[in-house]
Amino acid sequence: MGHQQLGRTGRRRRQRRSSSRHKVCSGDQQRFVNLLKFLSGRGFTGSNLKLCDFTGRGLQACFSIQSGQLLISLPESCLITTSTVLRSDLGVYIKRWKPRLSAILVLCVFLVFERHRGHDSDWSAYIQLLPQSYTCPAYFSDNVIDLLPANLRQRGLEQRKTLHELHSSSQDFFRSLQPLLKNPAQEVMSYEALRWAWCSVNTRSIFMPQSPSPYLTGEDICVLAPLLDLLNHRPDIQVKAGFNQVTNCYEIVSKSQTPRYHQAFINYGSHDNQRLLLEYGFVASSNPHSVVYVEPEIFHQIIQDDGLIQKMTFLQEHNFLHDLSVSIDGPSWRLMTAVRLLSLPLSHYHQWKAVLRGQEVGAERERWSLRTVQQVIKRLLVESVRVLEEIRSCLLHSSPSERQQLVLIQSLREEEQCILESGLDKLSC
C-alpha cells in the first residue's frame, strides 16, 4: 500500500512527533537553558542545535544543516583553558607551587574546585550539565575490567594506575588549597573527585595547543568547550574543526548533511571501539575502524616449535609483534607477516627482509601460516564466546552503574565475535 501524500499541516505534525520523540527530562532541559544563557553572557550568539535524548544525550538540529555550513562557533571567552584557571582564585596557589604542575592536573583541580563552590561558581551552569560519573575503565571494578579484551584490559589498568599515582603525588598541593575550601581538602580533593574531573577532561576536551606557561610543566593541549562537548561521535561523519584567529572562536564546520530533527554529530578521529571505550567510555555501532587485537602470547599456546622462543625474541627485537590484528577482511598484513616469519627455520632468518618485501616463503610454509592464523582466530573466538556468556550471567545480578559498563563490554565483545567470524570466513575462501 502506497504512502498518502501529506499536506503542509500533516508534514508539520509528523515533524513535531519526530522532534518530541527525543525530548530530555525537564531537569536537563533547564540546565541546558541555563548553559545557553551563561554562554550568551560571554559572547555566544546561539546555534541551530538543542539538547535531546537519543540513546543518550546529544544535540539535535533544529533546521537542516548543509555541508560547508558552520555547525557551532564558540568564543574564546567560553572556553576553559589553563589560562582560565591561572586567572581564577586557584591561580596564585598554582603559580607559587614547586615543582610545577601539569596542565591536565590544573584543569582537573579547577573542575573539582568549581563543583565544590556550587552556585557561587561562575561556571556552575556548565558544571551542573556534566555527567556525574563515566563509563571509562577508570570507573570499572576488578571483576568488570577482567571481562575486557587483553589489550584493552592492560590499558584500562594503566589508566587506573595513572589516576591513583596522580592523586597520591598531588596530596601536598591539595592541602595547600585549604584556605579556599569550605570542607577539609582530603574530602574535596578525594580520589573519586579527581577521577570524575580527569574523565571529564579526558572525554570532553578538544585538542587546542596553548602557549607555553612558566607556571606549568608538560604539554598543554586540552581545552574544555561547553556546549560543543555535547556533540557525539560518528565514524562516518566529517567535520572541519579548529580555532579561528580572525573571529577568535573555536569553530566546527560540517562536511556532511544533517536533516532537520536528526542528531548532529562530529568525528573524534579514526578510532577503533577499544580506543573509544578507553578514552571516551562508549562504543560506536558499525565502526569501520574496529579490529580485534592479537596478543603475541597466543603463539606459545598454538605453535609447537623448539625454536619458538628464539624466533619470538627476534620478532620482538625487530618490532614485528606490535599491532597484530584481525579485521572483517581477515588477518592484517602485520599478523600474516609475523606468522610467515615464524614459519621459517632459524637458519633462514637472514631472509626476513625479503619476506617483508612480499617474497613467498614456499607453498608448504604458506599453508602452515594460513592454518596457524586460522587456529589463532578460532582460539580468540572460543574466548569471546566464553566471556559473552559470563557477561550475560553478570547482568542478572548487577547494579545499575555496573550494568551500564557490562552492556558496553557486551557490545564490544559481540563486535569482536562478528569480526573474528568474518575474518575466518575470508581465510576459508
Language-model features and meaning:
Residues 79-80, 96-100, 104-117:
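Hydrophobic or amphipathic alpha-helical targeting/insertion segments
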